[in-house]
């Protein structure tokens, strides 16, 4: 059986590891969650034991849903007497996207109506609504015209642990605290005799989660503890209630899981060493922290001290982990000076320890002055955060000399990069953009385009793609090298990346624009995400990366239009537009390119997303010749030819010379009502409007195909919409 476990964005691959460690047969990451292969007992084990999950959703039905009537009918078709007992309470959570139903609360209401009406018609006492503590919580996901209805086996958001007695401003949610500790390798450090220090502990979330983690206490023991049980009783001894009273819930299996978890908790709490230290300048925050630690049963393992970061608590452990959720949001204003003082204090007091610091941005992370070995991005609610891991705080090779200061020119470039990062941040979060252009020759003396690529799996590293424009012959070679080194130094400083994470290329302009070629031959591919599709990119081995970032909005538009339709992509390159159309729900795709290298790459992209087979055809052919011979019909066609190409296997192609012939052949393949998107990046291109008007209607739509990150270079491509 396949079920879904949701999580905060950025934790997907950590959750895959946890799910597999807890006994699931299989797990595949997707955006903000994991698809899990396993039985009901596996799902209930995750409810009890997962430290990272937000919800565990057990599917009841999936059905086509074109409108509210289809939603009602699909829900009403289920045998609800087998799921809900007479008189139970009910809640429905809904998440909707697309055009079928646009209001989540209305969708939830229709689901509730269908359940209630079905039970009433069966002569069963109707359930009442309890949105806070229902007996049965249902979850509706409505996306791309398809509804999935599930039971929320946990009954509530799993980041709630049950021990939080006193909330505190800007507290890190418990499942995010667990992710920080896992990224920091805290359990291994504890097993080796190390300690844990949080110099800005607030209400104690990181320390309490750290103690419960190494004490082997299941999060569900306190979450579902009987509230009528005496509070002073150990979490390992309190009665544990059912998380859900859904009729399908396996009560016997749950009780066995709880007994085993309680035995492990007794043993772990008895052996827990007092090696956790927390400090905060706010006495009220520490009062909340101690109350929370007492409720969790770990107050004897944590030492709390009122102190600012200038006076870190003394630690006796020779090695350990520093964790910290430094202020960064509107409730606790971010202060780069505070981050700088934090970095100074850690270098002074615990230089040999490992540090895992949650920062609000790369700029704030840079302010610590610490060199990150690893860098991760995740979301704390709607806030995008950066986690840096420094191991150790002060690398041995740098203790004597310290960090190298940026030159005046490099500092100027760094300031511009930081300004651009900040300018794009709200747009990126709102649009879900993870790969973007951050700089495009903003400063004339640093003439380069810089793109950011966010890895979505593994360590979630950042990679930078720096394309240096060839300098005029009048610029001395020494100045060219100096400016190049200054720009690269600025890139590494602002984004806190190693040399190995920066790809540098110099573009040479010729008749056909930049030509493809091989470079480093590192064979280093990694995965990124765009519009919900996983994509394979390589920043080092070719001039281009496998993903043309400037076409991002056009790909999104075509994917939305291709739902349920036939999509054709000629000159398909690595097939990104085809893959995104397939993921969005295209009925079929055809991708044509002459290059076997790119078609193999395209195949890999389809496989990454679980797509392929006869519905998604790949054709190795000269695109123009293939179009003129093809007899199939397509609803949406994408044609993005190169400016110029030559090959031993095909005639030379020149977009200015051949575009009318190309467009005539492509338009002939359109179904009635079909559309063709034609785009190219030849700056001097002139569409032969009169010739095209003989066989198609045409409208230039270039402005709406340029996103904010390419607003400095609005002529990076031009795009026309054609139809018959």
From Swiss-Prot:
Pfam families found in the cross-reference section: Methyltrans_SAM, RlmL_1st, THUMP, UPF0020
EC class (word): transferase
Keyword Ribonucleoprotein recorded: no
Sequence ranges assigned to domain THUMP in this UniProt record: 42-153
Protein name as it appears in the record: Ribosomal RNA large subunit methyltransferase K/L
Catalyzed reactions: guanosine(2445) in 23S rRNA + S-adenosyl-L-methionine = N(2)-methylguanosine(2445) in 23S rRNA + S-adenosyl-L-homocysteine + H(+); guanosine(2069) in 23S rRNA + S-adenosyl-L-methionine = N(2)-methylguanosine(2069) in 23S rRNA + S-adenosyl-L-homocysteine + H(+)
Location within or outside the cell: Cytoplasm
Chief place where the protein resides: cytoplasm
Gene name tied to this protein: rlmL
An example molecular function term from Gene Ontology annotations: RNA binding
Keywords: Cytoplasm, Methyltransferase, RNA-binding, rRNA processing, S-adenosyl-L-methionine, Transferase
Protein purpose: Specifically methylates the guanine in position 2445 (m2G2445) and the guanine in position 2069 (m7G2069) of 23S rRNA.
GO cellular component, one term: cytoplasm
Stored InterPro entries: 23SrRNA_methyltr_KL, RlmKL-like_Mtase, RlmKL-like_Mtase_CS, RlmL_1st, SAM-dep_methyl-trfase, SAM-dependent_MTases_sf, THUMP_dom
Family: Belongs to the methyltransferase superfamily. RlmKL family.
Annotated EC: 2.1.1.173, 2.1.1.264
HAMAP family in the cross-refs: 23SrRNA_methyltr_KL (MF_01858)
């Amino acid at each position: 059986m396949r079920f879904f476990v949701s999580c905060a964005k950025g934790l997907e691959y950590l959750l895959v590891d946890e799910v597999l460690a807890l006994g699931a047969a299989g797990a595949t990451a997707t955006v903000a969650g994991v698809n899990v292969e396993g039985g009901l007992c596996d799902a209930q084990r995750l409810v009890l034991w997962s430290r990272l999950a937000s919800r565990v959703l057990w599917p009841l039905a999936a059905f086509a849903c074109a409108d509210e009537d289809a939603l009602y009918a699909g829900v009403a078709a289920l045998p609800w007497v087998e799921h809900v007992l007479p008189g139970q309470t009910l809640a429905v959570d809904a998440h909707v996207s697309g055009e079928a139903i646009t209001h989540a609360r209305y969708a939830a209401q229709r689901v509730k109506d269908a359940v209630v009406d079905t039970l009433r018609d069966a002569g069963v006492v109707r359930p009442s609504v309890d949105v806070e503590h229902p007996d049965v919580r249902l979850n509706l996901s409505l996306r791309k015209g398809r509804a999935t209805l599930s039971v929320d086996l946990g009954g509530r958001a799993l980041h709630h642990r049950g021990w939080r007695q006193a909330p505190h401003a800007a507290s890190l949610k418990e499942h995010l605290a667990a992710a920080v500790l896992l990224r920091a390798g805290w359990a291994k450090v504890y097993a080796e005799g190390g300690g844990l220090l949080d110099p800005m502990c607030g209400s104690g979330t990181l320390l309490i989660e750290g103690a419960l983690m190494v004490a082997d206490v299941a999060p569900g023991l306190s979450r579902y503890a009987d509230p009528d049980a005496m509070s002073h009783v150990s979490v390992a001894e309190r009665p544990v209630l059912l998380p859900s009273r859904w009729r399908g819930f396996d009560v016997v299996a749950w009780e066995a899981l709880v007994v085993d978890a309680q035995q492990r908790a007794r043993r772990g709490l008895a052996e827990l060493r007092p090696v956790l230290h927390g400090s905060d300048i706010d006495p009220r925050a520490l009062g909340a922290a101690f109350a929370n630690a007492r409720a969790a049963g770990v107050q004897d393992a944590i030492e709390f001290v009122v102190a600012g970061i200038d006076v870190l608590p003394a630690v006796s452990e020779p090695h350990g982990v520093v964790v910290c959720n430094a202020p960064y949001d509107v409730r606790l204003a971010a202060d780069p000076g505070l981050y700088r003082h934090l970095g100074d204090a850690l270098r002074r007091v615990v230089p040999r320890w490992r540090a895992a610091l949650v920062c609000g941005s790369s700029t704030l992370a840079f302010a610590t002055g610490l060199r990150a070995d690893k860098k991760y991005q995740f979301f704390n609610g709607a806030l995008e955060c950066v986690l840096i891991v420094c191991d150790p705080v002060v690398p041995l090779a740098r203790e004597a000399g310290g960090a190298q200061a940026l030159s005046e020119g490099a500092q100027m470039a760094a300031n511009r990069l930081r300004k651009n990062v900040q300018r794009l941040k709200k747009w990126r979060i709102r649009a879900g953009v993870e790969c973007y252009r951050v700089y495009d020759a903003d400063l004339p003396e640093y003439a380069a385009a810089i793109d950011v690529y966010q890895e979505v799996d593994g360590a979630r590293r950042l990679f930078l793609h720096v394309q240096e424009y060839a300098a005029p012959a009048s610029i001395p070679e020494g100045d060219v090298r100096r400016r190049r080194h200054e720009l690269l130094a600025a890139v590494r400083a602002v984004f806190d990346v190693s040399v190995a994470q920066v790809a540098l290329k110099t573009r040479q302009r010729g008749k056909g624009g930049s030509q493809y070629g091989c470079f480093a031959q590192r064979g280093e591919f990694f995965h990124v995400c765009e519009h919900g599709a996983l994509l394979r990119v390589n920043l080092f081995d070719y001039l281009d990366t496998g993903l043309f970032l400037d076409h991002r909005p056009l790909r999104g538009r075509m994917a939305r239009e291709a739902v349920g339709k036939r999509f054709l992509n000629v000159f398909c390159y690595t097939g990104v537009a085809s893959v995104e159309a397939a993921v969005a729900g295209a009925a079929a795709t055809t991708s044509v390119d002459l290059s076997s290298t790119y078609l193999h790459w395209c195949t890999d992209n389809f496989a990454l997303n679980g797509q392929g087979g006869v519905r998604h055809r790949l054709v190795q052919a000269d695109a123009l010749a293939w179009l003129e011979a093809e007899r199939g019909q397509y609803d949406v066609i994408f044609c993005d030819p190169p400016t110029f190409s030559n090959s031993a296997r095909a005639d030379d192609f020149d977009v200015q010379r051949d575009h009318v012939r190309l467009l005539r052949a492509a338009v002939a393949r359109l179904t009635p009502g079909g559309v063709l998107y034609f785009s190219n990046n030849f700056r001097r291109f002139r569409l032969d409007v009169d010739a095209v008007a003989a066989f198609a209607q045409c409208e230039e739509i270039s402005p709406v195909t340029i996103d904010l990150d390419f607003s400095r270079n609005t002529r990076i491509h031009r795009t026309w919409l054609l139809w018959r």
